[in-house]
């Protein structure tokens, strides 16, 4: 390991990043709370302000990926589609196999200039995650319980609110419903066999109802669906902890722009269309594992400096008083004070580790394990 790599793996560096992220995130959450008074007066202004506040937080994670770890992401796409990216609303269908797939999606959104307006259909539990979950509440993220009887009306109502959103956005949906694991895949393919559907090798069976209602509610304001198939070179197994340690990964993403008029309006036909899409995605993944590349032309959108500038702003604002506080605590010489300081560090470290654990595959939800079994017996 070289000197820079050794430095990136040190706890002190991680402490700095975590402190800046937590402190700035809580400040942003507090400001977002104050902006609630704007909503009844000017809803569109409220949305624009909160999109910028959201960027202040989410771009810090993009900075870690792009500038700290140096992870590269190559897009494979039709060159004719490139002028549309970042210039239109779109529904993004992304495979859900890697711990940092969401971060790669954010990186793409940042390079297209619409990170602050990125939306996602997320499980309701994430709304309670400090900083990120609280931030998402103010930017109208769509939360679901993953119980269709409860979600049918609430998700549709939330989606309809986005029809008059004032700026361009990407709406991400993981149609598989949960992150891929071998156990979930085995159960999912049992369901596919019971329903007479073709087996998938690299994906779980897609949940079609959430996609169908998203298309139905946003069809008139979203001109295209972006089918994104993500993988990593050399069988890399990327983790958020690896990114924090400065480990460099190499992501490849195949993006297909599918015009909305090509997607059936009928719910049953839309569901069949989505199943066919995932069969195609599976074939693309199989080809990638065989050849190491996706179809179409490789394209690397230029890295923008603003995520780094944003982090440097927060670091310069927060680190000086932080180090002043540390010096005063250490110089006090009080054993109680020092013990309290150590306790604070331990609690902060545990809190950050818990937030990182939300992304870890082996600590993911049991949704795909339990719910699929129930469906198979229905």
UniProtKB/Swiss-Prot annotation:
GO terms for biological process: CDP-diacylglycerol biosynthetic process; phospholipid metabolic process. SMART domains: PlsC (SM00563). Converts 1-acyl-sn-glycerol-3-phosphate (lysophosphatidic acid or LPA) into 1,2-diacyl-sn-glycerol-3-phosphate (phosphatidic acid or PA) by incorporating an acyl moiety at the sn-2 position of the glycerol backbone. Exhibits high acyl-CoA specificity for polyunsaturated fatty acyl-CoA, especially docosahexaenoyl-CoA (22:6-CoA, DHA-CoA). It catalyses: a 1-acyl-sn-glycero-3-phosphate + an acyl-CoA = a 1,2-diacyl-sn-glycero-3-phosphate + CoA; (4Z,7Z,10Z,13Z,16Z,19Z)-docosahexaenoyl-CoA + 1-hexadecanoyl-sn-glycero-3-phosphate = 1-hexadecanoyl-2-(4Z,7Z,10Z,13Z,16Z,19Z-docosahexaenoyl)-sn-glycero-3-phosphate + CoA; 1-octadecanoyl-sn-glycero-3-phosphate + (9Z,12Z)-octadecadienoyl-CoA = 1-octadecanoyl-2-(9Z,12Z-octadecadienoyl)-sn-glycero-3-phosphate + CoA; 1-octadecanoyl-sn-glycero-3-phosphate + (4Z,7Z,10Z,13Z,16Z,19Z)-docosahexaenoyl-CoA = 1-octadecanoyl-2-(4Z,7Z,10Z,13Z,16Z,19Z-docosahexaenoyl)-sn-glycero-3-phosphate + CoA. The chain crosses the membrane at residues 11-31, 125-145, 311-331, 338-358. This is 1-acyl-sn-glycerol-3-phosphate acyltransferase delta. Disulfide bonds: none annotated. The HXXXXD motif is essential for acyltransferase activity and may constitute the binding site for the phosphate moiety of the glycerol-3-phosphate. The keyword Lipid biosynthesis applies. Pathway: Phospholipid metabolism; CDP-diacylglycerol biosynthesis; CDP-diacylglycerol from sn-glycerol 3-phosphate: step 2/3. Expressed at a high levels in the brain, at intermediate or low levels in skeletal muscles, gut, kidney, spleen and lung. Barely detectable in heart and liver. A motif (HXXXXD motif) lies at residues 96-101. GO terms for cellular component: endoplasmic reticulum; endoplasmic reticulum membrane; mitochondrial outer membrane. It is found in: Endoplasmic reticulum membrane. PANTHER family: 1-ACYL-SN-GLYCEROL-3-PHOSPHATE ACYLTRANSFERASE DELTA (PTHR10983:SF8), 1-ACYLGLYCEROL-3-PHOSPHATE ACYLTRANSFERASE-RELATED (PTHR10983). Its main location: endoplasmic reticulum. It comes from the Eukaryota. GO terms for molecular function: 1-acylglycerol-3-phosphate O-acyltransferase activity; lysophosphatidic acid acyltransferase activity. Belongs to the 1-acyl-sn-glycerol-3-phosphate acyltransferase family. Keywords: Acyltransferase, Endoplasmic reticulum, Lipid biosynthesis, Lipid metabolism, Membrane, Phospholipid biosynthesis, Phospholipid metabolism, Transferase, Transmembrane, Transmembrane helix. Its EC number is 2.3.1.51. InterPro entries: Acyltransf_C, Plipid/glycerol_acylTrfase. It is a multi-pass membrane protein.
